[in-house]
Structure formats: C-alpha cells, structure tokens
Amino acid sequence: MKEKIIKTKVGQLFVSYQPAEKIAVFLSGAGSLPTYENFLPVIRKLPKNWGYLTIDYPNTGQSPLENQENFVLDDLVQSILEVLSQFKVIQYAVCAHSISGLVSVKVAESEQFCQGLILIELTTYSVLYGELAQNPYPEFLALQEKVQTLGGGYEYLKKIGQESFSVADFKILWAKAERSSDRLKSVQEGFQHYCSIAKSDFQNLDISFQFPIFILSQAYREQEYKDSEFASQNTQIILGGSHHYLHWSQSEKIVELLLEMG
C-alpha cells in the first residue's frame, strides 16, 4: 500500500493506494473518519485482483487543514479527478458514503472510466434542502436520543462497529478521527470545514450511465430514494442493515456488488 499527500485545487489530500487490475475508490461522508480505516471492513474482503484508492477530504482524516470557504462542490470533484489522473486509474468503481454519493455521481459525469457506483445511505436533496430537512424521519430523531442515552458518538459508533471491526482496528479508526476533529478546535473564526453545496448541485444530474448504480439503504428510506434525483433505469435499491454505516455491517454485500461490476 502506498500512502501519499497530493496537492489539488481544494488543498492537499491524503490518499492510500493499492494498485491492481481493477480499483475500488472509497469516499467517506461528512465527519472526521479517515477513509481507509472507515472502509476497512470492505477493503479486507477485496479479492486480489481488486486494489483500492481511499481519499480523505480536506480537514478530514489525515488530510491537512485547508479553509474551504471559497470552494464549491465542482472544485472538490475536480480535485478527485486530479487524484485519479495522478494514479492513472482507468478501470474503477466508486463506493461512497452519505454526501459523497453526490460527489461520486459528479465524478462519473466528468469522465468515462467509471464502471459502477455503490452509494451507501447517500444524501438526497430532500434531506439537505427539501421536505426531510424540515420534517426529519422519526427514526432519525430517535437515533439522536439513542446517541445521547449511550453517552455520545464514540459509544454509539463503538456499539454498532463491534461486529465489523476488531477492537484494535476500531481504536485506530477512532484515534485518527479524534486527532482530525481536535485540530478544528483551534482554527480561526470563519474557517469552513467543507466546500459549499448548493441546491443546484442536486439539480440536472445526468445519471443516464451505462453502468449499474446500487443504493444501499435502511428500509425506512426506500421511498426517499425511489423519488430522488438519483433514481434511473440503472438504479437498484438494496435494503438492509439498521444504521447509517452500512459499509460496516454490509461489507460482504458491497464486495459482491463490486465483483458484479467486474
């Protein structure tokens, strides 16, 4: 495995790369989790002819701090394309969590080498700007109460991750996430953690791809995805799991889907 920091439009990005005939590109959602460790339950199950490329966004994981105040989503997409180009990745599928589902669709729109998308509990327009932003799912509100009852995010993630991670792997994941988030306590006022994501970024998406799109979702979100901007003839919704981090609990299924693509 190669680890490298690559200079891009939005700042320096920390990446982990294992070359192979085919590449699984992993993108984490919002938060401070380092991408390699976040997707380790999937990465450990990849067959030998599949390599991987994991990318930490600015201010996340092991990527350096960089104010994102002046950057928009297209800038982040361009930066991901720069990383793919540097490693000459030409046969790949993207496995993306949460808001990175939108990022991965934009990446696939921009060039021709993507062979499939696995979108895990991806963020829709409705959740960020629409009906579900105004009236969240009861399940989501119940989750917030559960996290508080357990004593915070660490205890909750530890509980749901214990079946997917060894104790040692989870400690590494959380230690790196804490180091990443602790850095943000000392940034100056006005520092923006993420690039700006506008309503227009969800509109006029071109998802008429010739490759499969798999959406992994908890059952209660099925209709949201059927009605979303990500629905198409090539989109298949796969229900399962009982929490947002389905790449932990459904890692075997994700590997099966990758193998279907290649």
Which residues make up each language-model segment?
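Catalytic histidine-centered segment of alpha/beta-hydrolase-like enzymes
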Residues: S242-S251
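Flexible "cap/lid" loop of the alpha/beta hydrolase fold
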Residues: L117-L150
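Conserved HGGG/HGGXW glycine-rich cap/lid loop of the alpha/beta-hydrolase fold
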Residues: L13-Q62
